[in-house]
């Protein structure tokens, strides 16, 4: 086991505080509409230019092991806030720095760290209640566009695209962000459920020009196993022919005699049919077939359920308004599933998303949720250079998460004003002792810092402007850093999602209060590189 280095009490906290400051100072220059960019060196390719707090935080590693511990703890704050709310990472970092700084001073003055932590927790709880009480629900499309525009650092085009995408696919729908091949940013919406499997054979094509299959009002057979012989399906196929409707077969694979028979029937015109392979693999395939069954109001034919193919009747097949299949994708539009069943399935998938610890699983579950709940929108971000496209893509990602958060928990005035207005809520907090009161006062000072930083980044005097704001009692009245005017912030669209402000404060307080209560740091001693011995020298007589 390698030797360790240990630091104690004020020495330990001082080192950690230095690391916290290094990271937070690099991140906080990006805060607000007039925040600056940070340029990050990449190990290959051009440097990356960003105004996204979490991207900056993730790039910072310090030489000194003890300082690095402090920096990594604050980096954790930014990452956690980003995962939960998708934005507010810079605010969270600034809050964490303020709480750690004030807390370290209080501990150095001889206060009990555990009571300070209790005081901080009491204060945070009071502020969160105040934020929740004052949050305004958003409903209109223009409000959604405003939130998106602010999170995208004032880019109205991004705001417009996001509002349009959310209107089309709903709040649960998946919005993916890709890099475009052109200068323009564009939006493409896929309605209904789409999965990445195309037709098994090109002979199924109904539109030869576009090389795709289009069915109106088809039946959908969902089968979990391979189909190689059609003997068991003959009665079902006869019923489908009599109904005069097309049939889409989704199975693990369709091969041999089964495929030949379906193709021949299609070419002779007796049966409008198309077959596609089932999406996904293993357990995920089962779950996705079940999703398709619920969406179309059919039954997934599976031996687990004891249903054999020969016993399948027409009423066990799913129905949809339209199905479009091309070489690579199948889209089912407007399935005939019962709304109640689809909602129950959506709730079940949401519960799984909450429980899962794997990012990959979460992403796949969210895809399934979107396909059931509304559809998929793709925003393709354009730009003149690769660096510009990457930077805009970062901002679209931020804006998308912030907009979702705003729809979820409502909006508050932006510019750090909501936290300033929450100062009043702290007057009602009843701490048990002077040390807890000091903890409440730490939060009282910390929640003024984001507003000050935004104002400072805009080139104004932070303390002066914050003093002016606190003199006036109107909740939405604040300083618009973009224009340099005092106005009703919600009225002019300077807003923050309540979830983002709440998450930033809770995460910052959680990590910062742990740093305050730290009394010892343990790190590995750096290994001394010993130069290898030189090989023995030979004589010169050869």
UniProtKB/Swiss-Prot annotation:
Record-level GO BP terms = protein refolding
Write down the Gene3D superfamilies for this protein, in alphabetical order: GroEL, GroEL-like equatorial domain, TCP-1-like chaperonin intermediate domain
In its UniProt record, a GO molecular function of this protein is: ATP binding
Q: What is this enzyme's catalytic activity, as reactions?
A: ATP + H2O + a folded polypeptide = ADP + phosphate + an unfolded polypeptide
Pfam families listed in its UniProt record: Cpn60_TCP1
Which EC class does it fall in?
isomerase
In terms of InterPro entries, this protein maps to: Chaperonin_Cpn60_CS, Cpn60/GroEL, Cpn60/GroEL/TCP-1, GroEL-like_apical_dom_sf, GROEL-like_equatorial_sf, TCP-1-like_intermed_sf
The record's Gene Ontology cellular component field reads: cytoplasm
Q: What is its EC number?
A: 5.6.1.7
Keyword presence, Iron-sulfur:
no
Record keywords, A-Z? ATP-binding, Chaperone, Cytoplasm, Isomerase, Nucleotide-binding
Q: Which residues bind ATP?
A: 30-33, 51, 87-91, 415, 480-482, 496
Q: PROSITE patterns from the xrefs? A: CHAPERONINS_CPN60
Localisation: Cytoplasm
Matches recorded under SUPFAM superfamilies = GroEL apical domain-like (SSF52029), GroEL equatorial domain-like (SSF48592), GroEL-intermediate domain like (SSF54849)
Instruction: Report the family membership.
Output: Belongs to the chaperonin (HSP60) family.
Note the subunit structure. Answer: Forms a cylinder of 14 subunits composed of two heptameric rings stacked back-to-back. Interacts with the co-chaperonin GroES.
Protein's job: Together with its co-chaperonin GroES, plays an essential role in assisting protein folding. The GroEL-GroES system forms a nano-cage that allows encapsulation of the non-native substrate proteins and provides a physical environment optimized to promote and accelerate protein folding.
Protein name according to UniProt = Chaperonin GroEL 1
Gene that produces this protein: groEL1
